[in-house]
Design a protein with these regions (language model features):
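Nucleic-acid endonuclease domains
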Residues: 1-18, 23-136
């Protein structure tokens, strides 16, 4: 309600995680456990109860960087979840314009456009299945 509707992707009634923010990465390949999820520092104001991380694998793209446009979605992955306090305590802050190394120090040479808090997919919690629609 009000301005709060711009800070969360989902509102779940009667659940311990009421306000949920979904963070999505677009990819050329299906995600691997040692790949990363990200939250931009500029998104910290959202203050959800839970983050859910997803990846969409696309068949092709044109352009590079911020100008990249993706086509032919092939698959959608729910890669995990985490509560904000735990996420920001464990995540690595990647500076704007620098490659974003994983926790092992490897990089995919992607330079961040803004400061990002990154974490490996393998360090996330699995999705709480009680968040999924239940059969009536």
């Amino acid at each position: 309600e009000g301005s709060d509707k711009y800070n969360h992707d989902l509102i779940v009634d009667n659940h311990k995680y009421k306000k949920i923010e979904v963070k999505t990465k677009r990819r050329k390949y299906d995600p691997r456990p040692d790949w990363q999820v990200s939250i931009a520092k500029t998104s910290k104001h959202q203050n959800p109860d839970l983050y859910i991380f997803t990846s969409i694998t696309f068949g092709r793209h044109i352009g590079e960087g911020r100008d990249r446009i993706y086509y032919e979605p092939k698959s959608i992955w729910i890669t995990g979840q985490m509560q904000p306090k735990e996420y920001f305590a464990k995540a690595r802050l990647c500076q704007k314009g620098k490659p974003d190394p994983d926790r092992r120090g490897r990089t995919n040479d992607f330079e961040t456009h803004v400061e990002m808090y990154n974490m490996n997919i393998e360090d996330l919690e699995p999705l709480d299945v009680s968040l999924l629609p239940q059969k009536q």
